Amino acid sequence: MTLIKQYSIATRQQRSTRIDSDLSPEFFQGLVYHGTAQSALETLFRQYSQTGQSAYTLTGPYGSGKSTIALLLTGLLHEDAEVRDAAIEVINSESKDLLDQSVVYSKGWLQIRSVGGVNNPVNTFWDATLEALLEHSATKQLHSKYSKVEIKSESHLIETWESLFNEANSLVDGVLLLADEMGKSLEFINKNRGELHLFQDLAEVLGRIDTPV
């Protein structure tokens, strides 16, 4: 018996995952929850609940599934019940129990999903932020306010995020900020003599605010 009669690969699983555009209930159908994904997610859950650490880096070679794991986390914390239910179907009972014990969920998390590239990461991050405010039903009013803000620098972005996250505290369970292709963002900042410590500064700010991030 050939393997083709036992397995099939969905077209969406034959290309790289885009965390900014691939999220849907259909994305999770047929997704394999392998040991690496389980270990990465459960380590994150434990660290978050036990230490209160807010910033994490998921590393690995190209094609190892980093973006897919990030999008799975996105689904698990998403406001949309259909998306979240589809993501929960992917993980096993051990991971589900650990998720319930480690992460507060009732309103859904505001989710900023940014992918680095050839553009200024400040603009990419801010565009992703405005899209996130529109995506969550409780933060649309904040979008009306913050869409008028013109972000001028890395430090201005962090200051504005701090203000925004504090305002969103009562509206959402927390803020999930995902920066995919971080190397490309750092390369752009370096070439244009920007602030290479952007992510370090961001991590420090996240540790000071009350909103879970």
Regions found by a protein language model. Give the residues of each.
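Extended alpha-helical interface modules used as scaffolds for assembling large macromolecular complexes
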Residues: 1-22, 117, 121, 125, ...
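Walker A/P-loop-proximal flanking segment of P-loop NTPase domains
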Residues: 1-64, 71, 77
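Arginine residue identity/basic-tract feature
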Residues: 5, 12-18, 46, 84, ...
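Short, well-ordered alpha-helical scaffold segments within catalytic/effector domains
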Residues: 34-45, 158-162, 196-200
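A structural alpha-helix within SAM-dependent methyltransferase catalytic domains
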Residues: 45, 134-135, 183, 203, ...
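P-loop NTPase nucleotide-binding core
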Residues: 53-55, 59-198, 211
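Sensor-1/coupling segment of RecA-like P-loop NTPase cores
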Residues: 199-213
